Amino acid sequence: MPTPKKGARLGGSASHQKKILSNLAASLFEHGAIKTTDAKAKALRPYAEKLITKAKSGSVADRRNVLALVPNKEIVAYLFNELAPKFENRPGGYTRIIKLENRKGDNAPMSQISLVLEETVSTEASRATRAAASKKAAEEAQTEEAETEEVVEAPAEETATEEAAEEK
């Protein structure tokens, strides 16, 4: 992996940044969610998502590449055997960053980065719910129109009866 060039370095040197990201990714995969600073969470997100994408393929070469980046065999085994199948139907967006309150000691902006393990809603299911919702809305609109027509007609009839009474 080449030296990171984009943005500020975490920890000062490139090697320290690599170790920080490696340890953060290992903790994220182990616990499912971690609290860290905004900068570290934003740097960790693409790093972790690339590792998960490699784990989804499941090849031996990808396993060795991930082991080179996260040198913890138990966590890599968990990533490939347990987590990767959960993300099989998800094309990306495996992590979520939630902003938290600033840290008490130094007022650093904090975030929680977590794995998104919820099932994705298929497009067919979302289409079905949208169609059902639109049918329901159309029925409600028709009933409202019928009610407004009745209300509009009622005063017209009253005025006609009043006019007839005035003529007599």
UniProtKB/Swiss-Prot annotation:
Keywords: Ribonucleoprotein, Ribosomal protein. Residues 124-168 are annotated as: Disordered. InterPro entries: Ribosomal_bL17, Ribosomal_bL17_CS, Ribosomal_bL17_sf. It holds the Pfam family Ribosomal_L17. One of its GO terms (biological process) is translation. GO terms for molecular function: structural constituent of ribosome. It comes from the Bacteria. The keyword Ribosomal protein applies. GO terms for cellular component: cytosolic large ribosomal subunit. Residues 124-135 have a biased composition (Low complexity). The keyword rRNA-binding does not apply. Residues 141-168 have a biased composition (Acidic residues). NCBIfam families: L17. Belongs to the bacterial ribosomal protein bL17 family. Part of the 50S ribosomal subunit. Contacts protein L32. HAMAP family: Ribosomal_bL17. This is Large ribosomal subunit protein bL17. It comes from Corynebacterium glutamicum (strain R). The gene is rplQ.
